[in-house]
Amino acid sequence: MKDREHTEKRILEAVGSIIENDGFEKIGVNAIAQRAGVSKMLIYRYFGGIDELIAQYLLQKDYW
C-alpha cells in the first residue's frame, strides 16, 4: 500500500472512530486530524474539505 493510500485510510478510519465514539456532531477537521495524526492541511489536500471527506467515508462504507 502506498503512503498516500495508507494515510487516506487512517483519515477515513478516524472519521469512523469519531462517529462511533463521539457522535456525528463532533466531526470536524481538527478532531479528525488529531485522531488520524495528520495535519489539517493534509486533509484539505487529499479530500478538499470536510464535506468531501464525509462523502468519501460514506461511499467507502456503502451507506447509500
What are the language-model segments listed below?
Residues 1-22, 26-38, 52:
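Basic, helix-initiating cap at the start of DNA-binding domains
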Residues 22, 42-44, 55:
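Intrinsically disordered, low-complexity segments enriched in small/polar residues
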Residues 52-61:
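Alpha-helical DNA-contacting segments of helix-turn-helix folds
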